[in-house]
Design a protein with these regions (language model features):
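Bacterial Sec-dependent N-terminal signal peptides
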Residues: 1-24
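Hydrophobic alpha-helical and helix-loop surface patches within well-folded domains
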Residues: 18, 210, 242-486
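N-terminal, polar/Ser/Thr-rich
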Residues: 19-57, 65, 84, 141-147, ...
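Extended, low-hydrophobicity, Ser/Thr/Pro/Gly-biased non-transmembrane segments
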Residues: 23-24, 119-227, 523-533
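Surface-exposed beta-strand/loop patches in extracellular or lumenal glycoproteins
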Residues: 59-80, 164-169, 176-184, 440, ...
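A surface-exposed beta-strand-loop module
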Residues: 73, 78-141, 204, 513-519
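Beta-strand-rich binding/interaction modules
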Residues: 83-88, 454-455, 470, 474-528
Length: 539
């Protein structure tokens, strides 16, 4: 198995050999000693945002523990932003900038297990997004009353776009964060976690203070600035808060009614909402949406589907608001369970896209769920593997959404035991709650939980862009069948039916045959709605 895996990695490497990665990519995506030598414990961000100048000024207090003795660490801040000073124990530290990396020198070696805090002062005009959230950066807009309406989305681009941070998914602040943001009077800032209070600074600005108790991905730390109205709701064990533009209050009260049944569904299938200490918020934003932890960005214009369209093309997708359901699903898959490297972002996106189908099954039943998830197949591009290249800030194919979701549906039907499947999914979410994991961790878990070696299936769908082809032909009472377009060790069953009978086959690359009395093409069917494969009738 190890040799087969090396072959896969080699093939993946050959496919990506022409990809040009820069030093900037390696500095952001790589793990060198200047990063691994310390562990971030907490961020305390205190900034002022000037909407007119589109500028930020302030500091981030970064608390960390030294893991191995070091005299130099790496933090990150986009090179268009200014480092004003970095202070440790009242001393200004020397630093060097290399692209977006900031290498900080201490006057003495820091001992292992010692704890420290440095204050990183900075300022500047952060990058403006051309098309958020796909292109990272700030969005400065106005509401219908001419008031500022501001947001930020940086997934993939990097949180260091707007604040100094260890810009790696491998390290979340274990003790959470505080986010204090001063904005012009008459505006409100909504960030992650619980609202602690506001303070008029007597200079035309009011500071809004927020506190996060849980570990948090650096790219989900956020600011949302507008003339918001606060709508409060509650479940027995969870506060629900909605911050919406004043003009949309009535629409929001009606539209967000789907949040409670969504939460009930997700908690029954994935376990308790992971960040109940920090509450759950939907915050209206000037872009489509993003999974900001405990402050989910919402910009779907209070429409069903995806901006009023059904991405599945089946009609089922118009039953729910895509952004509310999908981005909330990320609270379990992406925010709670996080991938070590963005090359493994399928751990976020595949499971979250699958959560849409789970919600439909909770609300409308299995048949509509299958209709919806199979409708997603039309969006699969088969352009490149789902898993990207490690260590260079490189995501794999966008097929991680739909193909990844269809992979999970396939695994459900390979296991062919719904009670077992739902327990596996629930236990997966609970086992790796608030943990940072790799693809190997996921595969190993599902192998052990299912009692089946699913590795060849995962490899086929994650590491190649080839979809298995089930080739068959019927001659008299005989069915001839085999797999094509698969790796040599591919091993996956598929179900067929005829005359009200359902039979499980175990095809290989070599043609097999089976005698089935009363077999005829009219009653013959292949359950390709349960397995993401292509079907081809042979000659």
């Amino acid at each position: 198995m190890k040799n087969s895996f090396l072959v896969i990695l080699t093939l993946l490497g050959i496919q990506q050999i022409n990809a040009q990665f820069t030093r900037r990519d390696s500095l952001q995506g790589g793990l060198r000693i200047e990063r691994t030598s310390y562990d971030v414990k907490r961020y305390d961000l205190n900034i002022t945002i000037n909407p007119e100048q589109k500028s930020i000024k302030g500091f981030n207090d970064i608390t960390f523990e030294v893991m191995v003795p070091t005299q130099k660490i790496q933090l990150d801040l986009f090179d268009n932003m200014k480092v004003d000073s970095i202070v440790w124990n009242t001393k200004k530290l020397k630093y060097n900038r290399d692209n977006d990396a900031v290498f900080i020198d201490f006057p003495e070696k820091l001992a292992s297990k010692s704890n420290h805090k440095l204050k990183f002062y900075y300022s500047g005009n952060p990058r403006i997004a051309k098309n958020a959230p796909w292109d990272g950066g700030f969005v400065f807009k106005k509401d219908s009353n001419g008031k500022d309406f501001i947001g930020v989305a940086v997934q993939g681009t990097g949180a260091s776009l707007w604040y100094p941070v260890k810009d790696s998914q491998t390290d979340e602040p274990d003790s959470g964060a505080s986010i204090k943001v001063a904005v012009p009077n008459g505006l409100m800032n909504v960030s992650n976690g619980r609202f602690l209070g506001s303070q008029d600074l007597k200079n035309g600005y009011t500071r809004w203070d927020w506190e996060v108790k849980n570990p948090i991905n650096n790219y989900t730390i956020t600011v949302n600035i507008a003339d918001y109205v606060h709508i409060q709701d509650k479940m027995p064990d969870l506060d629900l808060d909605y911050y919406v533009l004043r003009e949309n209050e009535a629409k929001a009260r009606e539209h967000f009614a789907e949040v409670k049944p969504m939460m009930e569904c997700f908690q029954s299938k994935f376990g308790r909402y992971p960040f109940w200490e920090d509450g759950y918020k939907l915050v209206e934003t000037p872009y489509l949406g993003m999974e900001h932890q405990s402050a989910v960005a919402y910009g779907n214009k209070y429409k069903k589907g995806y901006m009023g369209f059904d991405l599945s093309g089946t009609g089922v997708g118009m039953f729910f608001d895509y952004i509310t359901i999908h981005e909330t699903g990320h609270e379990w898959f992406g925010n709670s369970i996080t991938s070590t490297d963005i090359a493994d972002m399928w751990i976020h996106e595949s499971f979250t896209t699958y959560s849409e189908t789970v919600f439909i099954e909770c609300m409308k039943g299995y048949d509509d769920a299958m209709k919806y998830i199979n409708g997603q197949a039309r969006n699969v591009k088969h352009d490149k593997p789902i898993i990207g290249q490690y260590g260079v800030n490189n995501e794999g194919s966008g097929d991680m959404y739909y193909k990844g979701s269809l992979l999970l549906n396939t695994l459900r039907h390979v296991i062919a035991d719904d009670e077992k499947w739902w327990k596996m999914l629930y236990d997966y979410s609970e086992t790796f709650k608030k943990k940072i994991i790799t693809s190997d961790t996921v595969i190993d878990y599902f192998n052990k939980a299912s009692g089946t070696d699913l590795t060849p299936i995962f490899r086929q769908y994650l590491y190649t862009n080839q979809v298995p082809i089930f080739i068959y032909k019927i001659e008299g009472d005989y069915l001839y069948y085999h797999w094509d377009n698969v790796m040599g060790d591919f091993n996956m069953p598929i179900d067929i039916g005829f005359e009200d009978k359902k039979i499980r086959l175990n095809p290989t690359l070599k043609e097999q045959k089976i005698k089935l009395k009363k077999l005829n093409k009219k009653s013959f069917q292949i359950y390709d709605n349960q397995f993401f494969v292509k079907i081809q009738e042979g000659n």
